[in-house]
Amino acid sequence: MDIHSQELLEQYRSLLPVYSEMAEVIPEKLKGFFDEAGLIVAAVEHRVKTEESLAGKLQLKGNKYSSIYDITDIIGIRVITFYIDDVDKVASVLERLFEIDWENSVDKRKAHETDSFGYLSLHYICRIPEKSFSDPEHPELNKIRFEVQMRTVLQHAWANMNHDTGYKSGVEIPKVYLRNLSRLAGMLELVDDEFSRIRRELADYRRKVQQLVASGNLSEVALDGDSFRSYLTIKPFDRLNRRIASINQAEIQEVDLSNFLPLFQAMRFTTLGDIQNMIKDFSEAANQIACFQIGLTDLDILASSEAPQNLCTAYILKNGGGKIGLKLMLDELNGPSESNEYMAEFLVEQSKDLPFMNQ
C-alpha cells in the first residue's frame, strides 16, 4: 500500500468514533422523520466500513481520493420499504433533510437489465447541511458524506440470496442456473409491482367507500371491514343510544363496535344499506326491549353497544330466530358460554309480550 493510502487509513482511524456515532444517530433520526411523514418502512440498517474493507478499496483505487472526505460509502445506511412506491417517498424525505451529492448518487432502477431485479436500489450520497446542524468543535460532521440505499423488502431479499449463492460475484455459473435465477428475478419484480398495485387499488376503494358513506348511498356499499369502519365514523347508532339512555338519564360510554361486523355478516347482511334498514325498521322495537330491560334499574352508565345489540335482538326475534338465534348472537358478541343460553331463553320469554312482537 502506498503512502497516500496509508495517510487515508490514518484519517479513517481518527474519524472512526465520529463515523460510528453518525451511523447510530442518523438512522434513528430518519425513523422519526418517516413517522412524521406517515411512512412505514420495514427496516433501517446501518454499517461502518471496516478498516480491512477500506484498505482493500484503497489498494485498488487509492489514488482516486485526495482526502478521506472523498470516500462516500464509509457510512452506509439502508432503508428497506414494503412497497416500490415508498422508495421515492423515502427519497423525498432525504432530499428535504440532507444535501444530496447528485453527481455520485445513482438510480440503479434506470439501468434495468433482464436479471437486475435485486440491484434496482436507489442510492443517494448525502451530507448534513450546516443550516440543519453544525458544531464548531466538530466541523467534520458537515464534511462527511454517507450513502443511503433504498430498496424494497423483496429486492433486499433477492440481493442477499444472490450474495449467498455467489451470483453476480464475477464467477461464471452454468447457463441453466443463470436462466432459472433470471426467471425468479422476473417473478419477484412482478410480485413487487402487484403489491404496489393492490395497495393503490385498496386506497382508491377506501376513498370511494368513504364518499358513498358520506353521501348516504349505503345500499351501494358492500359490507366488509373497511366499509364498516367508515360507516361507524358517521355514528349510525347514536340517535337510538341517546333515546335508550334517556330512560334512566344515563351516560353513554363509547366502546369498540367492530365485533358487530361478523354478527351482521352472520345475519346475512351484505351491504351497509341492510344495517341502515334495520335501524330504520327496528329502532322502536329495540327501544321497547331497552325499556323492559333497564327501565326498572338504576343504571346510569350504558355502553354504546346497547343500541346495536338491541336492534339485533329485535331483528332476530321478529324474523323467527328465537332462542337459537339469540344464543348465536350472544356467542358472537361475548364468546361462547352456557350463560348465553339462559340469557337467550330469558329474552325470548320476556319479549313475547312486548308490542313489537304482536304487530
Which residues fall in each region the model found?
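Short, charged low-complexity intrinsically disordered segments located at boundaries
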Residues: 55-64, 120-128, 216-228
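An acidic, glycine-/histidine-flanked metal-binding catalytic module
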Residues: 2-12, 16-18, 22, 142-286, ...
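Short acidic, glycine/proline-enriched loop segments that cap or flank alpha-helices
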Residues: 66-67, 134-136, 252-255, 299
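Long beta-strand-rich cores associated with HINT superfamily self-processing modules
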Residues: 68, 80-197
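Sparse, context-dependent recognition of short Cys/His-centered cofactor- or disulfide-binding micro-motifs
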Residues: 11, 15, 19, 29, ...
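Charge-rich, low-complexity segments
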Residues: 1-74, 81, 85, 211-214, ...
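Amphipathic, soluble alpha/beta structural segments
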Residues: 113-137, 176-209, 288-334
